[in-house]
């Protein structure tokens, strides 16, 4: 049995088009944008085109908007061309103590390696592997902080749970088929 050295929960907010994303970050009720270190987008000019997908990071805790904006090399062209289909997700570590550059790197590397065939614009880290065993649990919320449970409303690429086992150099991933909550 492999030892899993790191376990992180990433809380994703989305999907948002670019204007909704900007509004969300300006909202006083929203978590400070400095807590969002991960972002993912799906975009296409219109229904005639294939989806482009990309996951990225912003290690500086000075606001995700410094990275996710019209000057972004992959997202920017879609924003500037007023693409009809843009879905942006921003992610934060559920435990702010985990919000460290090395952890952000491990999580990004895990996503890129596990989903390299589905991330169309990620090219640099496709051959990298996480530096240690890691488990990521993804939870999804809309812009009103309500949990998203239906797969059709979540990012098309991600699973709910993703694990890399360093010792056996293997990945496991899957979705939670049913989650119930009680009050």
Protein language model annotation of sequence segments:
Residues 1-53, 57-183:
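Boundary/linker segments flanking structured domains
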